[in-house]
Regions:
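Active-site neighborhood of HAD-like aspartate-dependent phosphohydrolases
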Residues: 2-64
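General structural signal for secondary-structure boundaries
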Residues: 41-43, 63-64, 79-87, 93, ...
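Amphipathic alpha-helical interaction elements
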Residues: 25, 77, 203-204
């Protein structure tokens, strides 16, 4: 399952949450794939070998997906089906349950749950695999809502990133699923500016301190910049 997207409720306000550094203190996808790379010495060694060439490319949007695919291919070599990925995600979450639960941001989850109680259509849109975000949120007893995430497909005996739910592609994926009229969007990242700009009310949470000026410049005056518990991030603490 790459995402779970029931038809939008036309009578409900649409609320979109990013996941990493918004609901969760960390980069869940990177942590998961790092764990996969550490499973045996040859994966770790091969990843270290390519890192000087590949790692700098991750920082740039035009080359980010291709660079990530190198690591994903190494991490999943021998795993040619998403069913195998689902099993590894379940194992990863079980083995790291205590740490993961500590990373879930209580103020964020309170806002998330409030929107759901009020009958609004809540969607999570993340650059991580959707199965991973869903498994993590289930630890907080949050389920039965749409999760859109990056799509992995079989490739040469491993998996590759077919669609990265990131930047403009995140908005394309939301629109394809019928989630276009966004009332409120929550995100930490300047890469989500297309999402934040599309929302009638953008809310920036846990931004990097160096990005706060950019958000104030390009988003509507009065846009909240909040901190929901990421100690190393900026925003007004609540």
């Amino acid at each position: 399952m790459n995402h779970d997207n029931p038809k939008p409720d036309g009578n409900a306000e649409l609320i979109v949450f990013d996941f990493d550094h918004t609901l969760y203190d960390g980069d869940s996808g990177s942590d998961f794939f790092y764990w996969l790379l550490q499973r045996n010495f040859w994966r770790k060694g091969l990843a270290l070998l390519v890192t000087p060439l590949v790692a700098p490319l991750v920082a740039y949007l035009p080359t980010r997906r291709r660079a990530l695919n190198v690591y994903i291919w190494i991490a999943t070599l021998g795993l040619a089906k998403n069913e195998g990925l689902d099993h590894l995600i379940k194992t990863y979450v079980q083995q790291h349950q205590t740490d993961i639960q500590q990373r879930l941001l209580a103020p964020a989850l309170a806002v998330f749950e409030q929107h759901r109680r009020e009958g609004e259509q809540v969607v999570v849109a993340t650059g991580a695999p959707p199965q991973l975000a869903r498994a993590i949120l289930e630890l907080a007893q949050q389920s039965a809502f749409p999760v859109l995430g990056s799509i992995l497909l079989p490739s040469w005996g491993a998996l590759r990133l077919s669609r990265h739910c990131h930047h403009e592609e995140k908005m394309r994926m939301l629109r394809e699923c019928g989630y276009a009229d966004i009332a409120i969007a929550y995100s930490d990242s300047h890469a989500d500016l297309p999402l934040l700009k599309a929302a009638r009310k953008p809310v920036v949470v846990n931004p990097k301190a160096a990005r706060e000026a950019l958000f104030r410049q390009v988003l509507p005056e009065g846009t909240p910049l909040l901190n929901w518990g990421c100690k190393k991030r900026g925003g007004v603490r609540i």
